[in-house]
Design a protein with these regions (language model features):
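A residue-level detector for the "anchor" residue at the start of short, highly conserved motifs
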Residues: 4, 8-241
């Protein structure tokens, strides 16, 4: 079962041995909520290399690291130009994955997401492409800025930790800064930057190509990375529907 904590309309749930909870579902019917009904994310992903090779990555961290390292070495040998060729790391529904990039940057990829990245970054910049959600811990390098492209938005990173949510079905891209600093650029208007400070979230409207900034609870936004299920303003019946 799951233990639950409701704070200010936000629910945090963690898996621990507990008796079942009885909750009100749709139509006022009561139902028992068991741990087997809510599953944490598993470590699993598929790595599709730039040359079409498909590598399944699972819970074996040593095997995963070896596979990614071997791919990186091969990529360096094959690519003698400064034009990066991208690999695609994809997580399925219910899957999560952590990867360390060539520069030491760590990325935690949430479920149903894809990170496109090169084996070796260009000499003047580091750039990745995100679909879905990921938490970034970027290695500081003033000479090679780090960029994240996501659905019409470009984030320039100055050595920091932040979370980006950019699922296809979402009307907006959500960029939340945990520490450090980032600057957002909207596609087609690269001269205007929107800077974030820790604890603030930029909401980029995909349709309107406009953005605004608001304060958020970063524990809520990044709860998924710590194995927490976070639901805002929903009762348990709605969550299980």
């Amino acid at each position: 079962v799951v233990t639950g904590l409701i704070v200010g309309g936000v629910g945090f749930f963690r898996h621990e041995p507990q008796p079942p909870l009885t909750v009100e579902g749709i139509g006022g019917q009561e139902t028992a909520l068991y741990a087997s009904q809510i599953h944490p994310g598993e470590t699993k992903a598929v790595l599709t290399t730039d040359d079409g090779q498909v590598i399944d990555l699972g819970a074996d961290a040593v095997r995963n690291e070896k596979a990614i390292k071997n791919r990186r070495i091969k990529g360096r040998q094959e690519n003698s130009t400064d034009v990066p060729r991208f690999n695609h790391l994809t997580t399925p529904r219910g899957g999560e994955f952590e990867i360390t990039l060539e520069d030491g940057t760590k990325v935690w990829l949430n479920a149903e997401s894809q990170l496109s990245y090169p084996d070796t970054f260009r000499s003047d910049e580091r750039r990745v492409i995100l679909k879905g959600e990921a938490y970034f811990q970027v290695a500081h390098n003033e000479e090679k800025p780090f960029y994240v492209e996501s659905d019409g938005q470009l984030v320039r990173v100055y050595g920091t930790e932040f979370n980006i949510r950019s699922y296809e079905e979402d009307a907006a891209v959500y960029t939340t800064l945990i520490s450090g600093s980032v600057a957002l650029q909207v596609a087609g208007n690269l001269n205007a930057e929107l800077f974030l400070t820790p604890g603030r979230q930029a909401v980029f409207d995909k349709k309107e190509a406009s953005a605004f900034v608001r304060s958020v609870n970063t524990e809520v936004v990044t709860g998924w990375r710590k194995g927490l299920f976070v639901f805002e303003e929903q009762n348990l019946g709605q969550i299980m529907a």
